[in-house]
Swiss-Prot record:
Pfam families: UPF0181. InterPro entries: UPF0181. This is UPF0181 protein YoaH. It comes from Shigella flexneri. Belongs to the UPF0181 family.
Length: 59
């Protein structure tokens, strides 16, 4: 699977990690927290996008 992802600088990545940790500390599951932060990043990001390839490991 390929996805267009925001290209983030280190500071933005660090803030995203901190936001995920904050949400998890409030009781949200890690998957939900990651999905929410990813959605927020996509909605607010105005810079470049990178293409990433994800492989399903269900096989």
């Amino acid at each position: 699977m390929f996805a267009g992802l925001p290209s983030l600088i280190h500071e933005q990545q660090q803030k995203a990690v901190e936001r995920i940790q904050e949400l998890m500390a409030q009781g949200m599951s890690s998957g939900q927290a990651i999905a929410l932060v990813a959605e927020e990043l996509r909605a607010n990001h105005s810079g470049e996008l990178i293409v990433a390839r994800f492989e399903d490991e269900d096989e």
